[in-house]
């Protein structure tokens, strides 16, 4: 059985458990692809649930299974841990991979870690309470940079997602056309990205070049960034299209 199938079965079981117990039930963090599977499941349509990651436009989220009308407002078990260097002067330029590697190196499971947001030398890690306790007590180094970790407020303005608007001239909404324009490369070079499985839509690998993007889809091209697709702005005089995206910066 595929991993996503196992996850979907577990999420549906939580919905049944919530209905039976008369209380909110919460999952661990799930990927965008797993969220999409849940939202598309015909069986899930019969249950009440919501997805939340602890911050606006979170990519990794937990499922809160239940009904606010029946159980009151949910209280998702998500914590935010702020990480910063002990000395900014000697801090390295750390990446998402660096922080994630340091976290997993403590023996923490990926499923209890949500989004990792980086702004300059500071980082905000969304996680479940068990991981938060371990991070605060044990995370002391990321690569060669000594750091401190502490529980913090998730609603920190500087960590809210920032987007840069883009307008791209493309032949169509086909994924290969938008990918090439977004990455600033030729269609042939874009083909190699598809062959290497480096193009994702809503967290899922897409190798079908003719796939057509829909408004609200999240396009991610490894090595070139991520953007929200906002659809066609207008058709040009040469029968091409000006499409709008918001690139995460």
What is each of the regions a protein language model found here?
Residues 1-176, 182, 205, 212, ...:
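Ferredoxin-like alpha/beta domains used as RNA- or RNAP-binding modules
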Residues 193-194, 213:
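Short, well-ordered loop/turn sites that connect or cap secondary structure elements
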């Amino acid at each position: 059985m595929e991993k996503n199938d196992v996850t979907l079965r577990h999420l549906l079981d939580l919905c049944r458990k919530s209905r039976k117990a008369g209380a909110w039930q919460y999952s661990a963090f799930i990927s965008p692809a797993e969220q999409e599977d849940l939202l598309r499941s015909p069986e899930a349509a019969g249950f009440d649930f919501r997805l939340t990651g602890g911050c606006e436009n979170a990519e990794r989220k937990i499922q809160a299974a239940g009904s606010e009308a029946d159980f009151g407002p949910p209280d998702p078990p998500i914590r935010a841990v702020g990480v910063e260097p002990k000395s900014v002067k000697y801090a390295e330029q750390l990446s998402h991979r660096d922080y994630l590697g340091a976290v997993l190196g403590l023996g923490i499971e990926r499923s209890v870690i949500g989004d990792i947001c980086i702004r300059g030398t500071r980082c905000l890690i969304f996680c479940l309470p068990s991981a938060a306790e371990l991070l605060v007590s044990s995370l002391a180094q990321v690569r060669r940079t000594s750091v401190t970790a502490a529980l913090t407020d998730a609603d920190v303005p500087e960590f809210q997602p920032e987007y840069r608007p883009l307008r791209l001239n493309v032949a169509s909404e086909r994924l290969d056309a938008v990918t090439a324009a977004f990455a600033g490369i030729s269609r042939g070079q874009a083909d190699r990205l598809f062959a290497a499985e480096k193009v994702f839509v809503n967290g899922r690998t897409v190798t079908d070049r003719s796939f057509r993007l829909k408004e609200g889809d999240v396009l991610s091209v490894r090595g070139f960034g991520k953007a929200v697709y906002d659809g066609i702005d207008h058709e040009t005089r040469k029968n091409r299209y000006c499409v709008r995206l918001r690139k995460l910066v």
